[in-house]
Amino acid sequence: MPVPRFTSSLLRSPRARCFSTSTSRRSYEDSVQNLKIGKHTRVLYQGFTGRVATQNAKESLEYGTNIVGGVKPGGSGEHLGLPVLPTVREAKEQLKPDATAIYVAAPHAGKAIEEAIEAEIPLIVAVAEHIPLHDILRIMSMLKTQSKSRLVGANAPGIISAIGHCRIGFQPLPTFSPGHVGIVAKSGTLSYETVASITRAGLGQSLCIGMGGDVVAGTNFVDALRVFETDPDTEAIVLVGEVGGTAELEAADWIKDYYRREKDP
């Protein structure tokens, strides 16, 4: 049986690339601990000089986030008193970031995420909505071949450590207070309401992960639960679901299994 033309063309293509940078014993699941951000986290901005990114970076810097610089394709110099570099790879080499916040418009966000994966940035937070589905599917295929980079999003409010005063995203800062409740949510708005209620109750938050409402997401409920399970700062967990998909059911199965395997959960 002849090989389909498109398959043969792909096999011959000199541009075909492999994104696996780790041994076969490791996988994308091993990157889940990259979600544990804090004061130590060095944050890079892609699309750094844009209006939205600039305002967001100013707020995050004031909050205490350790922003080390940004990327503008073909750019250089400084912005907000921080270095601007032309590529993510150069930023990785010079600034040693632990995470990148991608403030790039949806049509170009996929390429920005790919660049961050190729540079092996440990944590990638993509906030843009309406990234084309074929871009996200391609990105997920890339992520599954490696163990260095972890994606939050796309279409996500981001991730924030209230204890470590580190925000990578656009969550409303006045609602957060340091504490020991971990939160993972699909809906950004519902997560803000949950955070505000916990703050009013005097409890506070440890780590809050906004996974985004898209069906295909870089991080899901189970990933967040695995982080909270070993996080000494988290004593209670809140899951905020949304209609659509099976993520909540998968989380319920994980929790049942957790109670079976832990003698003192």
Task: State the predicted function of each range.
Residues 2-265:
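Catalytic-core regions of core metabolic enzymes
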